[in-house]
């Protein structure tokens, strides 16, 4: 009996680690973040917009759609592993970039569009654009846009958001091919990107106008054109993740 207990210890430790890193730590991080934001004078506005976003994505099957498409098309490249933002964490990240109503936001690999909607609803940016290569995710993004438009048409208290929907755009393409040169703020979930893809993307982003801000998960940018303005650990759908914000130098 003791033998089975001893050999089972490593397995139990692995389970404990998974519970801590994927459930308990993210739970307390989210709770702490909410407590901090709730002390602010604009919390009711943030909370209301978060509720709208959560309602829009209440029955979201983006991860399933991504996995199904990759299986059907025998895509094994880990670059297409699906992950999503947490709305409140993304709000705090975007806020660090000091977004204005004149900024153009891009989400490179936008999935079902959560980042795109968040940037527009939270900060009323000039344009919010998502570039997504996988057709089912691109399709779901546009379905969400239609759903949001219908919701804002039907709810009098939310009709102020209706004109904003015209400033959302989803593009079915590779972010390495599409011209996002008008970007002021970029978000890229670089966690699973391959080295060749990441290096090519860095070279492309280095040509952005001075002052442009880039939010990056996991990976680092070592390039003379980029200045680090923030680094920390933030909550994502897959757990806690290193995030950095860079600025294009003048």
Feature roles, as predicted:
Residues 3-101, 140-180:
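S-adenosyl-L-methionine
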Residues 115, 136-137:
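Conserved short alpha-helix immediately C-terminal to the canonical SAM/SAH-binding motif I
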């Amino acid at each position: 009996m003791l033998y089975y207990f001893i050999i089972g210890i490593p397995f139990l430790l692995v389970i404990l680690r998974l519970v801590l890193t994927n459930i308990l730590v993210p739970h307390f991080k989210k709770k702490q973040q909410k407590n901090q934001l709730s002390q602010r004078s604009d919390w009711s506005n943030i909370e209301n917009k978060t509720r709208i976003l959560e309602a829009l994505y209440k029955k979201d099957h983006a991860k399933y759609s991504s996995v199904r498409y990759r299986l059907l098309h025998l895509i094994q490249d880990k670059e297409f592993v699906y992950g999503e933002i947490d709305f409140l964490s993304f709000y705090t990240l975007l806020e660090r970039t000091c977004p204005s109503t004149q900024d153009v936001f891009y989400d490179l690999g936008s999935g079902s569009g959560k980042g795109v909607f968040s940037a527009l609803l939270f900060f009323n940016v000039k344009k919010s654009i998502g570039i997504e290569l996988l057709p089912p995710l691109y399709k779901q993004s546009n379905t969400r846009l239609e759903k949001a438009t219908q919701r804002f048409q039907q709810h009098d208290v939310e009709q102020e958001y209706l004109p904003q929907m015209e400033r959302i755009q989803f593009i079915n393409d590779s972010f390495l091919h599409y011209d996002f040169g008008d970007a002021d703020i970029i978000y890229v979930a670089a966690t699973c990107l391959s080295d060749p893809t990441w290096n090519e993307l860095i070279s492309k982003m280095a040509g952005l106008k001075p002052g442009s801000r880039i939010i990056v998960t996991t990976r680092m940018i070592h390039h003379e054109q980029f200045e680090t303005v923030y680094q920390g650990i933030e909550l994502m759908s897959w757990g806690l993740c290193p995030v950095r914000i860079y600025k294009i130098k003048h």
